[in-house]
Amino acid sequence: MKILVDENMPYARELFSRLGEVKAVPGRPIPVAELDDADALMVRSVTKVNEALLGGKSIKFVGTATAGTDHVDEAWLKQAGVGFSAAPGCNAIAVVEYVFSALLMLAERDGFALSDRTVGIVGVGNVGARLQARLEALGIRTLLCDPPRADRGDEGDFRSLDELVQEADILTFHTPLYKEGPYKTLHLADEALIGRLKPGTILINACRGPVVDNTALLARLNAGQSLSVVLDVWEGEPDLNVALLEKIDIGTSHIAGYTLEGKARGTTQVFEAYSTFIGRAQKVALDTLLPAPEFGRITLHGPLDQPTLKRLAHLVYDVRRDDAPLRKVAGIPGEFDKLRKNYLERREWSSLYVMCDDASAATLLHKLGFNAVHHPAH
């Protein structure tokens, strides 16, 4: 059995070799000749999976180690009788911590308390729901917009996008990309919406590039109206609008979900799905794969305030480390993908062991995802 895996999927070789012969290949473009005698294909979001790629091939199963699936023609796979699995939620924690890293940086730079701000979350799935929980643990007011969930009658106080634009100081997008239909998200932030944003609004897009109209956003920024903008995703990736990058506060190369834990979850989820598909079901414990974190333990004295949270969060991940490299190479062909391929190891907050002498700090840090324990001072 021959299994093709994207060369940038961590732990793919060691896991899938338990099931058959593994060949690691580039994801963009996939070397088509390798598909002729392969049984399964494991990809990431850079690979377009459709009839053009797989028609007439022997592939019986496709796995994508990503939460999003807009790069996969699921209808064609189903019609062709090809098994399929994605990895929903695999990198949700990573994206939430990316958003926090950016917000804590902007709050320090501009001198505001996050607790004084209202955050509008557009798309309340795996990422949006976790972001809401962590913000609310800090006492930060959130407004939720998720029309599909509202229409299904899901529990929650769902508002219209218009209400979020009017009331929120921070607007962050966490939707899938739907190009048409009743829940279309293509250019959800269109020229009209971007024009209605209050001066000083923070706009964050860490889901899919085309959810925000990049041309309209640049036009508003060029008009000199104050917005703070954080973009991890771009229209036309791997190309991006360099003029837009120059105008925004934080710009990164579609890496918000790129923690070691998130990538490992993506790989293990599709590995488990494929092992079940071929009747050899296996489970993998994530911590058996991950290396020891960079920091052993941190001791925290006293309660948790915003500057302390920022220091802890940025000890694990400071978003600025990914902003600078993109600005250096923006517009040079091939460099966007190279930044993603050669991405520096990044961990999640759970990798940081924090000993707190203040019980409330330990409880709060634990709610926020840190590995925190209360250890009273003697």
Swiss-Prot record:
Binding of substrate, residues: S45, T66, Y258
Pfam families for the chain: 2-Hacid_dh (PF00389), 2-Hacid_dh_C (PF02826), DUF3410 (PF11890)
Ranges that cross the membrane: none
S-S bridge residues: none
The reaction(s) this protein catalyses: 4-phospho-D-erythronate + NAD(+) = (R)-3-hydroxy-2-oxo-4-phosphooxybutanoate + NADH + H(+)
Subcellular localization(s) per the UniProt record: Cytoplasm
One Gene Ontology term of the molecular function aspect: NAD binding
GO biological process, one term: 'de novo' pyridoxal 5'-phosphate biosynthetic process
CDD domains assigned to the protein according to its UniProt record, in alphabetical order: ErythrP_dh
Active site positions, chain numbering: R208, E237, H254 (proton donor)
Sequence positions that bind NAD(+): D146, T175, D232, G257
Described function: Catalyzes the oxidation of erythronate-4-phosphate to 3-hydroxy-2-oxo-4-phosphonooxybutanoate.
Oligomer and partners: Homodimer.
Name by which UniProt lists this protein: Erythronate-4-phosphate dehydrogenase
